[in-house]
Swiss-Prot record:
Gene Ontology MF annotations: agmatine deiminase activity; protein-arginine deiminase activity
Family matches, as Gene3D superfamilies: L-arginine/glycine Amidinotransferase, Chain A
BP-aspect Gene Ontology terms: putrescine biosynthetic process
Phylogenetic lineage: Bacteria, Pseudomonadati, Pseudomonadota, Gammaproteobacteria, Alteromonadales
Known EC number: 3.5.3.12
Biological source species: Shewanella baltica (strain OS185)
Annotated active site: 361
Protein name as catalogued: Putative agmatine deiminase
Amino acid sequence: MTNANVDATPLTTKPSQDGFYMPAEWAAQQAVWMIWPHRPDNWRSAGAYAQATFAKVADAIGGATPVYMGVPKAFLAEAQKVMPSHVTLVEMDSNDCWARDTGPTVVINAEGECRGVDWGFNAWGGHNGGLYFPWDKDEQVAQQMLKQHGFARYSAPLILEGGSIHVDGEGTCMTSAECLLNANRNPDLTKEQIEDLLRDYLNVKQFIWLQDGVYMDETDGHIDNMCCFARPGEVILHWTDDEADPQYPRSKAALDVLQNTVDAQGRKLKIHLLPQPGPLYCTEEESLGVTEGTGVPRTAGERLAGSYVNFLITNHRIVFPLLDPTTDDIAAQKLQEIFPEYEIVGVPAREILLGGGNIHCITQQIPSGK
């Protein structure tokens, strides 16, 4: 166990000025970060089910990449019992456990040096539709992770969650208007101003804007639940053939955009359709295990935003969520076809979905750089 309660040094320049860029997820990784789930008003049975699931995810990642887990001091003893021994536990306060959204975006340069972008965070909407209050500890998470690695820090003047962007490492950024242009994130910024900031801090050139994310996604439609890059020039889209499903118009509109766009290198995109699970719904038993608090209530019968696109690419391994016995094997087969050179590892992940996200949402990769 190590302690990370120290600030990382803020820089006054921007990554693009310094020759740094966000690499694609398939670039070599030195570590993956996770955070211990503990909110009783978001995770049933005070997080016990989620903690066991996070341990399985950490184990699946650990076969390919070292795992760090931020844990509040009060939960360290419990985490040591539950987590695999290969996981490095780091004492760290947090309001919840979404490392993708509260952790840093690590950028690299041609020499293999790593630095981190620390985005603004307001719990997916602040006082206008946000998911809990307060979020002050979450705002410190990125700094603590960067300090653990000794990386210098850029402080970006933009409210942004890591789950709202995907990049191909070759100049293209994919995102969703439903989230990034939402009035509860950066109401004073225009689309053009947001693009300019992403150019500055991700060092990208071209944007692919999908309108909406997955139906009932409480993050306001994060791209990482809806569509991702598989490799340069290839994307994977969350899909249903059922035209009566509320998801269909969202996926169809996204497909239309993807079919009529090019990436930063001028390539037309190859599009893989990954069938959705379910539809999946929260059960009464699952909803009763969540206590009342400042978090969003978990209601029986509520549709869950389940998606197989919410997987992690880490050092030639795909760690993806198992969500529905009728479609899990189809998803695994499809992923193996898309990634023939990768090991495909499924982890039962309904407990993460019940809390509002999935495997990509609870992980944040640290690129190797060198």
